[in-house]
Amino acid sequence: IALHYAVQLTRVNWGHLSDKTQNRTQWIIFGMLFLGIGGILASISIPLIESRFAQGILLAVFSYSLIGFGVGAAGTPLLALLASYSSKSQKGFAASITFLMMILGLAITGITVGIILDPYSHQKLIQITSSLAAITNIISFLSLRNLEKSLQNSSYTPNGKAISSNVSFIEGVKKVWMEREARLFTIFIFISMGAFSMQDPILEPFAGEVFGFAVGESTKLDGFHKIGTLI
């Protein structure tokens, strides 16, 4: 669980690359594809660990790395796309809607998958993960199709200019870090995301070990937790 968060430290680099190319869509689709593949491989690694421990652990490490890269490659350019075509007065509202939709999606997915997953089997988990990967990638592709191009051709004016190809990643980070507001916001995000994600390694194992919840039941519990967060 910690690995895919650690890999997401590359988010800054994904944002830098999308700034330089000014084609956010390709990075979002690329990230979603990696995320889907990583999720499928992660579910496959579970039964493999039981039969071939070393190979299963290697596959799990690889798959969770893919998940981290996928989340970073899709999420950061998406937020950049949102910021580019939102006016200054709309940025906060647009970001709020985006994160509310994310939490709502997590809640619906957690409860739905929890219901379907009982009684648990490795094969059922792989089937559910594969189906979710296909559905989310199709929805993402259809949602983004021609969106950025239509915004570029419309009256919307992107906020900010493309980063010069001569500006390196390190130079870009240094320039941003020199801004006091950027530093304070980074600290705020660090604390808030730490609090939001802290339940991941605690809630579901605790429900299983202390209350004897099955896998599907603890997954539903996580979905209800997200509903509480949403409210």
Predicted regions and their residues:
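C-terminal ends and interior cores of transmembrane alpha-helices
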Residues: 30-54
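Central cavity-lining transmembrane alpha-helices of secondary-active solute carriers
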Residues: 1-19, 37, 223-231
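Juxtamembrane intracellular "pre-TM" segments in multi-pass secondary transporters
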Residues: 151-186, 210
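Glycine-rich segments within core transmembrane alpha-helices of 12-TM secondary carriers
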Residues: 4-11, 92-117
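Symmetry-related core transmembrane helices of the 12-TM Major Facilitator Superfamily/SLC fold
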Residues: 124-143
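Short amphipathic helix-loop junctions that connect adjacent transmembrane helices
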Residues: 1, 201-220
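Cytoplasmic helix-loop-helix junction between adjacent transmembrane helices
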Residues: 65-100
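Pair of pore-lining "gating" transmembrane helices in MFS-fold secondary transporters
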Residues: 1, 65, 177-199
